[in-house]
């Protein structure tokens, strides 16, 4: 396959590293006249690489030398003698492949070049695998995070719509309800929706005791109906107390006792509210329940609590238990007491006077309250 070099040129391989060009020339000159002897040496070390080229002037002499000297020992080593091929093919075919092979393995085996290359190879592979592993796991980590992140986003996406809406429902849902309640309470008739209004007015009374009587609507609206339960008992106390009042104060014929006794629906709650007013002011308070939410609770509380205690104290059936829930709960709730006082004079001042309560209210403090109530009702 390799193309033969010029005729008369022989390749001599397997030489001893100690063999020199002079020895080769003396050994091969007996077959003919030699034009050139070329011993291949290492460039760095200048030592023989183990092969050489001998060129005869007559190609026939080269054939004779190859035939006779091939496999014969020279300096203790058998040598190989054959027709030389062209240098490019020699480098690629014979010398070439061995050098690359020798270079490849030698470099691979050598610590200097091969080691680094080998080290570079495996380390590069290791970093590669590490990079793959690190990158891979990070992708996997990213994958899982993406999976985790992805699914959780999916989860958060559903949960976001669900959870966030739920959150939105929690913060925003009740406020709209409050707003709706506020709007309802802002409207005249919605004040009649005091199944909320009443409850909120309770909570508003608790919270509004410290506020001015002018914060009528909004304060009750600000506080949801969550604390209605605690005040429902107070309603019951009011209702029961008002029932007792209505029964004993001669309200039996009035509309309010029925409201207290029946109380089937929200309207009945309105009635108990009205009844609360009516325990003081009977039916007139029914009409404008909204005015419940606004009054100075403390002053009313003092007047009302003291008067109520004065009025109720005389009765055995109305011990401090009646007067206390009435006074304390009413004290915290500034709202309805204004309604109470104005209706007091409007509604049943005389009936009140007939009752034990009437005396202190009609005589001493009753007169002052309408003034206060009227002054504040202006707002």
From Swiss-Prot:
Residues annotated as domain RRM: 8-86
Role this protein plays: RNA-binding protein that plays several role in the regulation of pre- and post-transcriptional processes. Implicated in tissue-specific regulation of gene transcription and alternative splicing of pre-mRNAs. Associates with chromatin. Associates with nascent mRNAs transcribed by RNA polymerase II. Component of the supraspliceosome complex that regulates pre-mRNA alternative splice site selection. Binds non-specifically to pre-mRNAs. Required for embryonic development, in particular of the brain.
Localization (cell): Nucleus
A Gene Ontology molecular function term of the record: RNA polymerase II cis-regulatory region sequence-specific DNA binding
GO cellular component: catalytic step 2 spliceosome; euchromatin; extracellular exosome; nucleus; supraspliceosomal complex
Protein name: RNA-binding motif protein, X chromosome
Gene name per UniProt: rbmx
Composition skew (Low complexity), residue ranges: 304-327
Transmembrane segments: none
Example GO biological process: negative regulation of mRNA splicing, via spliceosome
A Pfam match: RRM_1
Record flagged with keyword Electron transport: no
């Amino acid at each position: 396959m390799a193309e033969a070099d010029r005729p008369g040129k022989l390749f001599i391989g397997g030489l001893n590293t100690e063999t020199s060009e002079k020895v080769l020339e003396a050994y091969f000159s007996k077959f003919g006249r030699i034009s050139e002897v070329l011993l291949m040496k290492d460039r760095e070390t200048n030592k023989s690489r183990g092969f050489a080229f001998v060129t005869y002037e007559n190609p026939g002499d080269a054939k004779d030398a190859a035939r006779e000297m091939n496999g014969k020992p020279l300096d203790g080593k058998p040598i190989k003698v054959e027709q030389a091929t062209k240098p490019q093919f020699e480098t690629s075919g014979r010398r070439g492949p061995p050098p690359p092979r020798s270079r490849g393995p030698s470099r691979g085996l050598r610590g200097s070049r091969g080691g680094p290359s080998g080290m570079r190879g495996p380390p590069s592979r290791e970093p590669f695998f590490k990079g793959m592993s690190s990158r891979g796991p990070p992708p996997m980590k990213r994958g899982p995070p993406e999976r985790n992140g992805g699914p959780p986003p999916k989860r958060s996406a559903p949960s976001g719509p669900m959870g966030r809406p739920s959150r939105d429902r929690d913060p925003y849902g009740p406020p709209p309800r409050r707003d709706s309640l506020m709007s309802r309470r802002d409207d005249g008739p919605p004040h009649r929706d005091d199944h909320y209004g009443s409850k909120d007015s309770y909570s508003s009374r608790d919270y509004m005791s410290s506020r001015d009587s002018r914060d009528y609507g909004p304060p009750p609206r600000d506080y949801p109906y969550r604390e209605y339960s605690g005040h429902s008992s107070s309603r019951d106390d009011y209702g029961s107390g008002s029932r007792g009042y209505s029964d004993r104060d001669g309200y039996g014929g009035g509309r309010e006792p029925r409201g207290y006794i029946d109380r089937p629906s929200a309207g009945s709650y309105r009635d108990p509210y009205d009844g609360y007013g009516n325990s003081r002011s009977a039916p007139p308070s029914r009409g404008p329940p909204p005015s419940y939410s606004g009054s100075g609770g403390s002053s009313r509380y003092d007047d009302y609590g003291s008067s109520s205690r004065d009025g109720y104290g005389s009765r055995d059936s109305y011990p401090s238990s009646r007067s206390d829930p009435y006074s304390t709960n009413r004290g915290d709730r500034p709202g309805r007491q204004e309604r109470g006082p104005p209706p007091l004079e409007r509604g049943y001042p005389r009936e009140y006077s007939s009752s034990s309560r009437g005396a202190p209210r009609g005589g001493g403090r009753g007169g002052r309250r309408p003034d206060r109530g009227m002054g504040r009702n202006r707002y």
